């Protein structure tokens, strides 16, 4: 497979590796971006395991809670400007209200909102506002107590990041603190048990390869892996993360002190995982001039 400059740039952007190292990683792994990242980490050439997904889409995430049921909905637009539009915000709020009774994203799009489906309401809004829009995704959660939080709010209940936290016991103030923590730190799962076993095994293998590069005895390597995986879990699982409100405690320990059990969470961020293709404007103009 031919390794292009764009592929090298993407790998450099996601790992902080040098140009020649990035090119070699792609060559060694036949252009497989994910395998190239692991190769760089194994060789100690990646500055950090940065997330390769680039956020590009605009819009708003809205959260709604009714009793022990909460929903979060992402509605995308082409520009950030539309997210500040009162008509767009009103539509997003209406969609979130409807989402409280929807089972999934398809049911939400087909649900009634003011005499028309949500999907048709969005199509009509496109004609009025003049930008392409879409109801991209929704997530829901149930629990004894459900608390919501919006980061970078554009209007009540909607902003760039929406979080829902479900707890048994504890008070609303603690739930709000946990929701703010989740917005800031973005844990991958509630606990180790909730992580994809394949992801855990892959991380363990990467750490094993890194440790073996040191040339240390196998018994020492095994102890190194235990320590490194413990550190990994403290970084990606909510209950094991250092609590932003009190860094001396893990979130799990803070929950015990608050008399609460955290049973789940939802975190949606606008544009998460969507990549937009950036056109080279100068090249486009040059091409047009040449005919």
Swiss-Prot record:
Keywords: Cytoplasm, Elongation factor, Protein biosynthesis. This is Elongation factor Ts. Its main location: cytoplasm. Associates with the EF-Tu.GDP complex and induces the exchange of GDP to GTP. It remains bound to the aminoacyl-tRNA.EF-Tu.GTP complex up to the GTP hydrolysis stage on the ribosome. It comes from Roseobacter denitrificans (strain ATCC 33942 / OCh 114) (Erythrobacter sp. (strain OCh 114)). GO terms for cellular component: cytoplasm. It is found in: Cytoplasm. HAMAP family: EF_Ts. Pfam families: EF_TS. Belongs to the EF-Ts family. InterPro entries: EF-Ts_dimer_sf, Transl_elong_EFTs/EF1B, Transl_elong_EFTs/EF1B_dimer, Transl_elong_Ts_CS, UBA-like_sf. PROSITE patterns: EF_TS_1 (PS01126). The gene is tsf. SUPFAM superfamilies: Elongation factor Ts (EF-Ts), dimerisation domain, UBA-like. Residues 79-82 are annotated as: Involved in Mg(2+) ion dislocation from EF-Tu.
């Amino acid at each position: 497979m031919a390794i292009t400059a764009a592929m090298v740039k993407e790998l450099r952007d996601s790992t902080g590796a040098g140009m020649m190292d990035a090119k070699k990683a792609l060559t060694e792994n036949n252009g497989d971006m994910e395998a190239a990242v692991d190769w760089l980490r194994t060789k100690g050439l990646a500055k950090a395991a940065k997330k390769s997904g680039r956020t590009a889409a605009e819009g708003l995430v809205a959260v709604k809670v009714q009793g022990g049921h909460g929903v979060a909905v992402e509605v995308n637009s082409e520009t950030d400007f539309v997210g500040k539009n009162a008509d767009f915000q009103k539509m997003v709020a209406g969609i979130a209200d409807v989402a409280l009774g929807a089972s999934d994203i398809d049911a939400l799009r087909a649900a009634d909102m003011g005499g028309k489906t949500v999907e048709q309401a969005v199509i009509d809004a496109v004609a009025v506002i003049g930008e392409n829009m879409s109801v991209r995704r929704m997530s829901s959660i149930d629990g004894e107590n459900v608390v919501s939080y919006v980061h970078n709010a554009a209007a009540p209940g909607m902003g760039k990041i929406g979080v829902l936290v479900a707890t048994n016991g504890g008070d609303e103030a603690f739930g709000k603190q946990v929701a703010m923590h989740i917005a800031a730190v973005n844990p991958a799962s509630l606990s180790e048990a909730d992580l994809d076993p394949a992801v855990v095994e892959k991380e363990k293998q990467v750490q094993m390869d890194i440790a073996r590069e040191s040339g240390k005895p196998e018994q020492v390597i095994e102890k190194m892996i235990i320590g490194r995986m413990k550190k990994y879990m403290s970084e990606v699982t909510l209950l094991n993360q250092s609590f932003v409100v009190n860094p001396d405690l893990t979130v799990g320990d803070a929950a015990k002190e608050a008399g609460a059990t955290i049973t789940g969470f939802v975190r949606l961020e606008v544009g998460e995982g969507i990549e937009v293709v950036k056109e080279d404007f100068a090249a486009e103009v040059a091409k047009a001039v040449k005919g």
